[in-house]
Amino acid sequence: MDGLTAAESRELDQRLQKRQVKEFMSVFGNLVDNCFTACVDDFTSKALSGRESGCISRCVLKSMSTQTRLGERFGELNAAMTAEMQRR
C-alpha cells in the first residue's frame, strides 16, 4: 500500500482478514439460523426428516445463490461508478 511501512501494511492486512472472517461468520450464522428456523420443526428425533433435509438444502442453495448474485451486482455497480468517475 502506498505511504505505509511494511509493518503498517502487515497490520492493515491482518485487520482486514479479521474483519472478513467476522463478516463471513455473521453471514454463516444468519444462514444457519434462517434455514433452521424455516425448515426444522420436528424435535422428536435426533435426525432430520427427509423433508427437513431437503428444505435445508434448498434454503442453503438459494441463500448462497443470492449472496453470489448480490456480490456480482455490487461488482457491476462499482465498475460502472468507477468508469463514470474516470470519465469526469
From Swiss-Prot:
Topology versus the membrane, per the UniProt entry?
A: Peripheral membrane protein
Q: Where is this motif: Twin CX3C motif?
A: 35-59
A Gene Ontology cellular component where this protein is annotated is: mitochondrial inner membrane
**Which InterPro entries would you find in this protein's record?**
Mito_inner_translocase_sub, Tim10-like, Tim10-like_dom_sf
GO MF entries? metal ion binding
Name the GO terms of the biological process aspect: protein transport
Q: Tell me the domain of life.
A: Eukaryota
S-S pairs: 35-59, 39-55
Pfam families, sorted: zf-Tim10_DDP (PF02953)
Keywords per UniProt: Chaperone, Disulfide bond, Membrane, Metal-binding, Mitochondrion, Mitochondrion inner membrane, Protein transport, Translocation, Transport, Zinc
Where does the UniProt annotation locate this protein?
Mitochondrion inner membrane
Question: Which interval of the chain is the signal sequence?
Answer: none
According to the record's subunit comment, the protein's assembly and interactions are: Heterohexamer; composed of 3 copies of tim9 and 3 copies of tim10, named soluble 70 kDa complex. Associates with the tim22 complex, whose core is composed of tim22 and tim54. Interacts with the transmembrane regions of multi-pass transmembrane proteins in transit.
Family in the record = Belongs to the small Tim family.
Q: What does this protein do?
A: Mitochondrial intermembrane chaperone that participates in the import and insertion of multi-pass transmembrane proteins into the mitochondrial inner membrane. Also required for the transfer of beta-barrel precursors from the TOM complex to the sorting and assembly machinery (SAM complex) of the outer membrane. Acts as a chaperone-like protein that protects the hydrophobic precursors from aggregation and guide them through the mitochondrial intermembrane space.
State what protein this is by name: Mitochondrial import inner membrane translocase subunit tim9
